Amino acid sequence: MSFQEQQITFDSRHHQLTNINVWTPDSQWLVYDVRPNGGSFTGLTIEKIHAKTKQQQIIYTATQGAHVGVATISPVAPVRYAFIHGPENPDDLWHYDFHHRRGVIVNEQEDLGAVN
């Protein structure tokens, strides 16, 4: 069996895939974070794209100066997205580090926003 490689995104942004759990349980959607500047932790959205239709959806948008990234999906239903969330209203001394962030979960079934 041979596989043919396919490009599924074409816009000029950095679509950052985590190295594990990026497919929805039905294997139809890929989740990623969008980083305007390569590997920097400066993304504002967590998004997903349908592998066949190329339809894109924003799952979460950070507000108040916060940044988000490193998105993963629960491998079993219900679909839940987990990702790193930086602080709202960071000061000039803030930099990306393990003690300057939190993990959050967004449940696709409910519109509750991000839950710590």
Language-model regions: role of each:
Residues 1-116:
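Sequence signature of WD/YWTD-type beta-propeller architectures
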